[in-house]
Amino acid sequence: AYTVFANLGSRVAPSAIVRVTDQSGAVLWEPRPFVESVLSREEAWIMNDMLRDVVRRGTAYGAVVANGGFRHPAGGKTGTTNEYSDVWFIGYTADIVAGVWSGFDRPKRIM
């Protein structure tokens, strides 16, 4: 879902293969992405602005500062479960979406 925001309202079907090249680097094949508009650019902009605030000054800000700062436009969402037994973050830039989860096999309070 977060890729739609990064792509300004367009859903692009993911591909595990970016491209196929020969030994000299010439591109032999690239996937033709399936693109579908699912949000207006304005709706995507609003979501990006809200999710960027999580990184700029919200609940993810401490992690950004603790790691020397992150100087790229990025957005994301933090979360915790009841009793703080799991914590997670889903973040994105224009190029990548990633998720991080921290928890235990058996419910145990982290914080």
Predicted regions and their residues:
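A penicillin-recognizing enzyme superfamily signal
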Residues: 2-111
